[in-house]
Amino acid sequence: MPRYELALILKAMRRPETAAALKRTIESLMDRGAIVRNLESLGERALPYRISSHSQQHSRGGYFLVDFYAPTSAVENILEHLARDIDVVRPNIVKHPLTQEVKECDGIVPVPLEEKLYSTKRRKK
């Protein structure tokens, strides 16, 4: 199963309502075959612009990241379910970037300045 990341914006609510909405979201992921690795809260803050969702205008929201594994066939179903949730302002699922081996930098390659600064053509005398 591929690894995904759910970027989730919930409408501004008090802590118990936010916890209930997150619990409902995580349970819906697991009901659709996902394995949740991590849930990270990025805090509540002002949205960059007013977002209209479920006939309401939102200017503040809670930002959350959910790291999970899921079958590729379930991702579209998960997004459809989250779009119908009245507490979710904006759901977005992206494929988690694969961890790649980091290559060490070779450093700065010296450039011969004489070739760059001086013309190789001969001057007329």
UniProtKB/Swiss-Prot annotation:
Keyword terms, alphabetized: Mitochondrion, Ribonucleoprotein, Ribosomal protein
Similarity comment text for this entry: Belongs to the bacterial ribosomal protein bS6 family.
Quaternary structure (record): Component of the mitochondrial ribosome small subunit (28S) which comprises a 12S rRNA and about 30 distinct proteins.
Pfam families: Ribosomal_S6 (PF01250)
GO cellular component, one term: mitochondrial small ribosomal subunit
Organism per entry: Mus musculus
Example of a GO MF term: rRNA binding
Protein name: Small ribosomal subunit protein bS6m
Cross-referenced Gene3D superfamilies: 3.30.70.60
Gene name for this UniProt entry: Mrps6
Classification of source organism: Eukaryota, Metazoa, Chordata, Craniata, Vertebrata
